[in-house]
Design a protein with these regions (language model features):
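Interface amphipathic segments
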Residues: 1, 9, 13, 19-112, ...
């Protein structure tokens, strides 16, 4: 189907694309299987639609859009927090959490995760870090380049930046201005 603009003498096509039981293997051998998608173009050349896929530990469903050479996938993903962070008595997470995920791919691939962590327990010798599952703690995790992952974590209890053995962990917001002045290539600051 299409649209003819007689003033511009231009035809714009509206197309539908369907993918059934497809798969992708990334350069790092990460497999995404059983991809089903329905995508539509519109007159501004944006591609959008819905998808479902199997990643190694779960099925995901979400939306997809492509515009100006940028691909954005949105979905909810489930993460076993026990496997995510375990620093012994200092900070241990437990529970299974659902995150809203946004994967953006243009010149690089980035991933943003957000959740209120309502299914996660924080256990720590430091009282300020403890959290019951019933307590909401709106948290955002940003991995700005998946090929060279660094983790920026931010919520009302703490903020952290983790890059290999470098970065920082800041409890509260008292040191926000000091953190902006630090160079994190020479160690991990607490």
């Amino acid at each position: 189907k299409g649209y003819f603009d007689s003033k511009r003498n231009q035809i714009s096509a509206l197309n539908k694309f369907m993918l059934n039981d497809s798969y992708i293997v990334t350069g790092t051998k990460y497999e995404v299987k059983k991809i089903d998608a329905v995508l539509y173009t519109n007159i501004n050349q944006k591609l959008s639609g819905i998808f479902s896929a199997k990643i190694p530990d779960q099925m995901i469903n979400g939306s997809i859009s492509v515009f100006d050479n940028k691909l954005i996938l949105r979905s909810d993903v489930s993460v076993k927090m026990d496997n995510f962070v375990n620093f012994g008595d200092y900070l241990n997470l437990s529970g299974t959490e659902t995150f809203n995920a946004k994967l953006s791919i243009d010149n690089n691939a980035s991933l943003e995760l957000s959740s209120n962590l309502s299914n996660t327990t924080f256990s720590s010798y430091i009282d300020e870090l403890n959290k019951r599952p019933s307590d909401n703690l709106k948290t955002k995790i940003l991995i700005s380049d998946l090929s060279q992952p660094t983790y920026e974590i931010e919520n009302n209890k703490f903020s952290a930046y983790i890059n290999n053995n470098n970065g920082y962990f800041s409890l509260g917001s008292s040191f926000d201005e000091d953190i902006k002045k630090l160079n994190f290539i020479d160690g991990f600051y607490i």
